[in-house]
């Protein structure tokens, strides 16, 4: 059972997350020749002040 664990910053809509799950699942199924029903996707959302880019929190970088 292939599992993808994705970390994203807060702020995406449910529709965007559904699209992400669908497209990652399709890509994994295709590239690994695995039935899509066996693919799992886990999304972990983080507050922007919990993620650093270049030594600064993403919240300060307007990301």
UniProtKB/Swiss-Prot annotation:
Active site residues according to the UniProt entry: 2
Gene that specifies this protein: nahJ
Key word ATP-binding present: no
Top-rank taxon, per record: Bacteria
Pathway(s) of this molecule: Aromatic compound metabolism; salicylate degradation
EC number: 5.3.2.6
Quaternary data: Homohexamer.
Family: Belongs to the 4-oxalocrotonate tautomerase family.
Listed SUPFAM superfamilies: Tautomerase/MIF (SSF55331)
Protein name: 2-hydroxymuconate tautomerase
Species: Pseudomonas fluorescens
Functional note: Catalyzes the ketonization of 2-hydroxymuconate stereoselectively to yield 2-oxo-3-hexenedioate.
Catalytic reactions of this protein: (2Z,4E)-2-hydroxyhexa-2,4-dienedioate = (3E)-2-oxohex-3-enedioate
Keywords carried by this UniProt record: Aromatic hydrocarbons catabolism, Isomerase, Plasmid
GO molecular function, one term: isomerase activity
The keyword Isomerase is assigned to this record: yes
InterPro entries (alphabetical): 4-OT, 4-OT-like_dom, Tautomerase/MIF_sf
An individual GO BP term: salicylic acid catabolic process
């Amino acid at each position: 059972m292939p599992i993808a664990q994705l970390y994203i910053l807060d702020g995406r809509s449910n529709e965007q997350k559904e699209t992400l799950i669908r497209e990652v699942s399709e890509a994994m199924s295709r590239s690994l020749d695995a039935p899509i029903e066996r693919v799992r996707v886990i999304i972990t959302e983080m507050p922007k002040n919990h993620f650093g880019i270049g030594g600064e929190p993403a919240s300060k970088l307007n990301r």
